């Protein structure tokens, strides 16, 4: 086992503080509307220019192992806040630095770190309750756009597009962010249920210009096995042909004789038909077929539940007002499923989302949920250069997360004002004298976000803090225009979830760092002397004539 380096007490805490300060000082310059850019060298390609706190934090690795531990702990604050709320990473970093810096001074002066941490925890609990208390639910399109605009570093276009996307697909809907081929940032929405499987043969196309099959008032056959044999499929084809309705077949696969017969019937005009593969794989495929069946009011024709393909009748088929199928996707619009059945299915998927511990499963379940309740919106991000594209895409994703957070838990005045307003709740806390130091640490730290926003805008932070503290409600400092305004009326708002998560995560990690008594790191290996050269090259004597 490799030898270790160990540091104790004040020496350990000082190393942590150096690391925390190095990382936080690099991150906090990006805070607020007048936040500065950070340029990051990349091992390949052009440098990355960003104003995103978590991106800056992720790039930082320090040479000193002990200082690096401090930096990595604060990095965890930024990452956790980003994961939970999607924004607030810089605020969380600023808070963590302020709490730890104040706390480390008190511990160095001989105060009990465990008691300080207890006071800290109780103060945070009271503050979180107060933030929820002053939170306002988000009501309309305009407020959603404001949250999106602020999280996208005051880019109004992005805010408006996110608000429009949420309006179209609902708060349960899936909104994805992709890179556009053009310069403009646009929004595309897909109504109804779409899955990523296209037609099995181009002969099914009804619109050669757009290369898609579009059919109205469609019957839908949903089968969970391969169809290769025509005789199994014949009875249902005959019934559908008699009814005169177009038919969409969704099955694990359709091949050989069955596919050839469908194509021939389509070309002869006997039957308007289209065949696609079932979406997903394994158990997820079964679940998605069941979703389609419920949405269209049909049944999954599966031998597992006693339905054979050859015995299928028209009443087992799903129905939809319209379907469109291109080479990659199938979209089912206005299925005939019963509303009560769809809501029951939605409830079941929501329960599974709450229970699952896998992020991948949760994402897939949310996609299924969105397909049942709303639809899917795609924000296509356009930019002039690749560097701008990456930066803009990251901002859109941030803004999207923050907007979802605002819809979840409401909004509070932005620009660090909410923390100053929530501070009054700390006056009522009756704690032991040592624990009261923890409360004082938090009080001082809560001023730090607004102080940093002001400093980044080139204004004296202390004057701004004092003026805003003496104001009421949403009165605060608009750093973008250098004026004092009602923050909510001016549209400077933060999602409650973001403010809450930033404070909780910062206090949690700062409290742990404060109560650290020892640090252990691997001892760096000493570089030995160069090994001797192989025989014949000793001293390279034979090359003397080259001097």
From Swiss-Prot:
GO terms for molecular function: ATP binding; ATP-dependent protein folding chaperone; isomerase activity; unfolded protein binding. One of its GO terms (cellular component) is cytoplasm. One of its GO terms (biological process) is protein refolding. Belongs to the chaperonin (HSP60) family. It comes from Geobacter sp. (strain M21). This is Chaperonin GroEL. Keywords: ATP-binding, Chaperone, Cytoplasm, Isomerase, Nucleotide-binding. Its main location: cytoplasm. Forms a cylinder of 14 subunits composed of two heptameric rings stacked back-to-back. Interacts with the co-chaperonin GroES. Gene3D superfamilies: GroEL, GroEL-like equatorial domain, TCP-1-like chaperonin intermediate domain.
């Amino acid at each position: 086992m490799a030898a270790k380096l160990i540091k104790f007490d004040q020496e350990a805490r000082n190393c942590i503080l150096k690391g925390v300060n190095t990382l936080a000082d690099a991150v906090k310059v990006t805070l607020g509307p007048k936040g500065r850019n950070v340029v990051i060298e990349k091992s390949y390609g052009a440098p990355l220019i960003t104003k995103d706190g978590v991106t800056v934090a992720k790039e930082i690795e320090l040479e000193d192992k002990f200082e690096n531990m401090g930096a990595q702990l604060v990095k965890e604050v930024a990452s956790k806040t980003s994961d939970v709320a999607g924004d607030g990473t810089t605020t969380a970093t600023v808070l963590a630095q302020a709490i730890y810096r104040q706390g480390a001074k008190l511990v160095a002066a001989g105060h009990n770190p465990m008691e300080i941490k207890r006071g800290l925890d109780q103060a945070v609990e009271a503050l979180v309750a107060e933030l929820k208390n002053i939170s306002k639910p988000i009501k309309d399109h305009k407020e959603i756009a404001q949250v999106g605009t602020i999280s996208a570093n005051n880019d109004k276009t992005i805010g408006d597009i996110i608000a429009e996307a949420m309006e179209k697909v609902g708060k349960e809907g899936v909104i994805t962010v992709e890179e556009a081929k053009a310069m403009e940032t646009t929004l595309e929405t897909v109504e109804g249920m779409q899955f990523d499987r296209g037609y099995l043969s181009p002969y099914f196309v009804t619109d050669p210009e757009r290369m898609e099959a579009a059919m109205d008032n469609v019957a839908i056959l949903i089968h969970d096995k391969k169809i290769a044999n025509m005789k199994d499929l014949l009875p249902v084809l005959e019934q559908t042909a008699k009814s005169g309705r177009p038919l969409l077949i969704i099955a694990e696969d359709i091949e050989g004789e069955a596919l050839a017969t469908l194509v021939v019937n389509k070309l002869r005009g006997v039957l308007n038909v289209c065949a696609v593969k079932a979406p997903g794989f394994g158990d997820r495929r079964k679940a998605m077929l069941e979703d389609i069946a419920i949405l269209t009011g049909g049944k999954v024709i599966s031998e597992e539940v006693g339905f054979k393909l050859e015995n299928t009748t028209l009443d087992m088929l799903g129905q939809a007002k319209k379907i469109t199928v291109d080479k990659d996707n199938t979209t089912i619009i206005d299925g005939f499923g019963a509303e009560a059945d769809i809501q029951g299915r939605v409830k079941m998927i929501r329960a599974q989302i709450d229970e699952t511990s896998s992020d991948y499963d949760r994402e897939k379940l949310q996609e299924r949920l969105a397909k049942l309740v709303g639809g899917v919106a795609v924000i296509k991000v356009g930019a002039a250069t690749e560097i701008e594209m990456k930066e803009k895409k990251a901002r859109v994703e941030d803004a999207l997360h923050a907007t979802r957070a605002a819809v979840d838990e409401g909004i509070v005045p932005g620009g660090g004002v909410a923390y100053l307003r929530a501070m009054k709740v700390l006056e009522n806390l009756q704690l032991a004298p040592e624990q009261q130091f923890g409360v004082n640490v938090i009080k001082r730290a809560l001023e730090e976000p607004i102080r940093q926003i002001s400093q980044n805008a080139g204004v004296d932070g202390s004057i701004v803090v004092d003026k805003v503290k003496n104001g009421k409600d949403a009165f605060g400092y608009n750093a973008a225009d250098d004026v004092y305004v009602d923050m909510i009326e001016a549209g400077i708002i933060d999602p409650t979830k973001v403010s809450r998560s930033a404070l909780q995560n910062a206090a949690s990690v700062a409290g742990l760092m404060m109560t650290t008594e020892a640090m252990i790191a691997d001892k760096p290996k000493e570089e030995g002397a160069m090994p001797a050269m192989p025989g014949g090259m000793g001293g390279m004597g034979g090359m003397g004539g080259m001097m």
